A protein has these predicted regions:
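A conserved beta-strand-loop-helix scaffold within acyl/acetyltransferase catalytic domains
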Residues: 52-65, 72-192, 232
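Active-site/acyl-donor-binding loops of N-acyltransferases
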Residues: 60-61, 70-77, 213-254
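Residue-level preference for non-acidic, small/hydrophobic
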Residues: 112, 200-203, 230
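Conserved acetyl-CoA-binding loop-helix of GNAT-fold acetyltransferases
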Residues: 192-204
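Hydrophobic pocket-lining residues that define ligand/cofactor binding sites across diverse proteins
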Residues: 207
């Protein structure tokens, strides 16, 4: 690879395929490969200006005639949980978060498979093997970490934390100006615990503690029920044509 290719990466466009979020539409992605010889500041720039990471690929929607996918990030220093979010935090008070290196385990994979089979059995990740899961966790050229959420058993005085039941896992990247939530999953049997919301709340608090101003939540699509939850976390910024634009939390948040 030449020095010019390191500074100016090559981009590619995927073939059109059905959009998983908007019925009757086709999606394409613009993507580039992330490698160790690319400048860290270049990779960080991509991931803080609308690109998302999947293993060692950085991609952004590149759909003809459609700009529905909007990057969103929470302004963590100004964020205040609404009443519903406070109840969710209280409901999960027995969960303990542990930040660890991006090292997959068979226990994580079992939980991942349970989650996928229950919630996304017809999605693009339905056929992921244990090797695929390992690659999703390990393949990264930036500062990536896992957060495991384990439930402390009643009276577990001498039981090590890694023996507590695993309830949820989040895969995240640490960027120069925030944390990017790459993927998360949880025990579908705990549907009433709202673990997806709880993990976002926990990472907002974590970003604030370590002095990072943003939590990146990926793409939000107006009118998509799958994406509607992201509008509840605010104030947030949404990436426009040229800059990030401030948006207050949705009025239905409480």
């Amino acid at each position: 690879m030449t020095e010019q290719q390191k500074k100016f990466p090559e981009f590619y466009v995927t073939a059109p395929q059905p959009c998983p979020y908007l019925a009757g539409r086709l999606e394409r992605k613009l993507f580039t490969h992330l490698t160790n010889d690319k400048p860290p500041e270049l990779i960080d720039r991509l991931l803080t200006t609308g690109f998302r990471r999947s293993q060692n690929i950085a991609y952004v929607p590149y759909c003809e005639g459609c700009q529905a996918c909007v990057s969103v990030r929470v302004l963590v220093d100004e964020f205040e949980p609404n009443r519903s979010m406070s109840r969710i935090t209280a409901r999960n008070r027995r969960l303990v978060a542990r930040r660890i290196a991006p090292e997959p385990s068979s226990e994580q994979y079992r939980l991942f498979r349970t989650y996928i089979d229950a919630r996304h059995s017809d999605g693009g990740m339905a056929d992921m093997s244990v090797l695929d899961y390992r690659m999703m966790i390990e393949d990264s050229v930036i500062d990536t970490f896992l957060t495991e959420y384990r439930e402390k058993p009643e009276g577990a005085v001498d039981l090590a934390i890694d023996q507590w039941p695993l309830k949820a896992v989040a895969l995240c990247d640490r960027l120069t100006d925030g944390i990017s939530m790459v993927y998360s999953f949880y025990d579908p049997a705990e549907a009433n615990a709202s673990l997806g919301t709880f993990m976002i709340l926990d990472h907002i608090a974590f970003a604030r503690r370590i002095g990072l101003p943003h939590l990146y939540l990926g793409y939000w699509i107006e009118g998509s029920r799958k994406m509607a939850y992201k509008a509840k976390f605010g104030p947030q910024e949404r990436l426009g044509t040229d800059t990030w634009e401030r948006v207050e939390p949705s009025s239905s948040s409480d």
